[in-house]
Design a protein with these regions (language model features):
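Acceptor/aglycone-binding surface of glycosyltransferases and processive sugar-polymer synthases
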Residues: 36-59, 76-157, 188-196, 202
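Residues at the C-terminal ends
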Residues: 6-7, 59, 87, 173
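Hydrophobic helical membrane-anchoring modules
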Residues: 2, 16, 128, 152-223
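Short beta-strand-to-loop acidic/aromatic patch adjacent to the donor-nucleotide binding site
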Residues: 62-73
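Residue-level signature of catalytic and energy-coupling elements of molecular machines
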Residues: 53, 71, 142, 171, ...
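A conserved acidic beta->alpha catalytic loop
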Residues: 16-25, 72
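Residues at the starts of beta-strands that form the adenosine-phosphate
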Residues: 10-11, 64, 177
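Short beta-strand/loop segment that forms part of the nucleotide-sugar
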Residues: 1-2, 9-19, 39-40, 68
Length: 223
């Protein structure tokens, strides 16, 4: 991002969930103009990591947040499209490699069809609108969305992948402005994803079903 000049477009915050590759050394971060390094020390996985980042951004007064994975697979040159979406009043912008202008490069076969046939259809049904690429963490959220009392993303129920699924659908359910942004997601040739075990896959399906059944909604009259 620093080499591409992206760091000049917005403040950059790194939310670390336990990196051990040396990329978060203080001197390295300073040389890249990173504003803050947040380190998750408590329980939970991705959702806990994201809650930490969202909370910091809201407390610091930011009006919008763009999130992107740190694995180098996403097209950082697409970040201005997310910033433009936020500036135009969009509340939730989701990256998609499958819409016009997007590109899916070397996506593993099983992952491609799991998104197309399971993940995206279920979350589209839950959202009440068509969404094409629902597993991506490359997204933008408005302050209005995350701070809405009908959303409440900082609850402890969000620990693993629940928050990504929930926030994917909740904006549409509330009638907020939602768009998909064309991006490129590139996997190295021949890469076989190993991040999610068989047990993890069952857990993911359970999360999708709970999202579909609105089990992550706040328990109040406003939900």
């Amino acid at each position: 991002m620093h080499a591409a000049g992206t760091m000049k477009l917005a403040d950059v915050i790194v939310a670390d969930g336990g990196s051990t590759d040396g990329s978060l050394e203080p001197e390295e971060l300073r040389s890249c103009d990173v504003r803050a390094l947040l380190v998750k020390t408590g329980p939970g996985k991705l959702s806990a990591q994201l809650r930490m980042a969202y909370a910091y951004a809201l407390e610091e007064g930011y009006e919008g947040i763009v999130t992107i994975d740190g694995n180098g697979k996403d097209s950082i040159e697409s970040i201005p499209l997310f910033l433009d979406a936020l500036d135009s009043g969009v509340d939730y912008a989701q990256a998609s490699r499958f819409i016009a202008g997007g590109r899916a490069i070397n996506t593993p076969f099983m992952r491609h069809w799991a998104i197309k046939l399971v993940h995206a259809p279920l979350l589209s049904f839950a959202a009440g609108r068509r969404l094409t690429d629902t597993t991506q963490g490359f997204r933008a959220y408005s302050r209005r969305y995350l701070a809405d009392p009908r959303v409440r993303p900082f609850r402890d129920v969000f620990r693993t992948y629940e928050l990504l699924a929930y926030l994917t659908v909740r904006a549409s359910q509330l009638g907020l402005r939602v768009v998909e942004v064309p991006t490129t997601r590139t996997y190295p040739p021949g890469e076989i994803p190993t991040k999610i075990s068989l047990r993890g896959q069952f857990s993911m399906v359970a999360i999708l079903l709970r999202t579909l059944l609105r089990q992550y909604h706040p328990r109040s009259k406003a939900s």
